[in-house]
Amino acid sequence: MKLYKFIPAAALLLMASCSEDEMDRINTDHGNPPIDVINGRLMITDAITSTGFTTASGGYSYYASVYNEQIFGTGNNQFKNAELRQISEVAGSSTFNNVWNGTYATLLNLKSIIAKCGEGGLNSGQKDLLGMAQVLAALNWGILTDMHGDIPCSEALQGGALKQPKLDTQESIYKYIFALLDDAIANLTEAKTKGMSNVGDQDLLYGNDNSKWLAAAHAVKARYKLHMMKRDANAAAEALTEAQAAIDAGFDGMVLDIYDGTESLMSPWQAFQYSRDYCACTTTVQSLLKDRQDPRENVYIYYYSAGDEMDPADPDYQAPVCGIPGDETMAVLSGAWSLSAPKWLTYNAAGDYPLYPTATTHILSLSEVYFIMAEIQARNGADCTESLSSAINANFNDIKTFGSISQSASEYVASLSSRISDNPVKEVMVQKYLSQCRDEQVETYNDIRRCKALGEEFITLTNPKNMNGSSSRWPLRLPYGNSGVSSNTNVREAYGDGLYVFSEPVWIFGGTR
């Protein structure tokens, strides 16, 4: 009898236990598992995509293109404000908040991947994955500090554990970048030697080709060594060594080619133009092209829509109209359709969809590496024509995606012989400026500031709004993101009223922070 008394109680206990287990299962978000159980190889895909889409070719690139006069800002909104150098846009903390947050989110992802590759981690011993993450981390930290100077780094990315991370000096961040790259080179060398393939097709850049990642690590190191020319007498020679190492290892560019052309997966620059119509050609670029009879002019200076194209032989021919930097009448137009656009940003004949929505994104191009070599060779008094031809040829191959080019790179460089003879460094920098007009404007912005720090000016910026009386309105750096300014007192104090962007260069380019 006692036995039967316990059976209902046991059944109730079992039901309660099952119900509790079931509720635990129901309350678990199986569609979004916690980050600690996700394999790092799956996370690297997002890190690659966001590095290209957000950090290398997002807000930083868009605004830098206007400051560099590679794009004319129109549309009577944000880009108009940037074109006219309005303080609220150029120095405002809201301007770069999205890309500031997006880059830190990418770095948090990469931090987790690197941790998973450590001893006892989910991806322990996977040197290929670790090396990839370290290269991408170096790139993201590099762009973030190049744009903003001193930033939260060593204490950042800790969530609620540390809500007020300190600002690290740019000097210390650069040391960290080089440490990341040295470790990446060692890890990728080991991965290559051992034939590791832990990432597979989750690697959207190279399909887990460790040799290509190793070459990319050297290319990234060459870029950041070049940035150090103002601060380190050995930086130029080291940049040349790393650039040559990248080429010798088979570097062919860090190029993101993932877009299907739909509205949900369109190349970032094309998506930006499609949503805003802010981007037109500039007379600054046009003049440089015309002065050199540059064969890229028909691609760089085009119509808003392919349907607007006219034959120059047509008696009613109207040439594309470029924006004049700082021209308020042009800047306040309701959209770029009243002006010209580079062909890669043009619309189809119907004028209702981008003509090239699948255009690739350069995280770091092959032409950039050859330009680094050409610049250092020119500065050393060596013959730079071979490297310069290779740099321009790499750019021509990219631009041919959008239109025909009537000359070969070697023929074009031959036509520049007198310019190269007169001032080889200047011509290299002009050619680099022109070659980076499509989606590499962040590095152009760095070049202009780097040369300025060295007492050089090879690109003549013509926007009269760069000065307001005796006060500069051309930004020597970009303002911090609003999330940092509003939530971190250290960032808020560094930001102040934002006007420091007009007077204080970042440390690598001669400033103090």
State what each model feature region is:
Residues 1-16:
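Sec-dependent bacterial lipoprotein signal peptides
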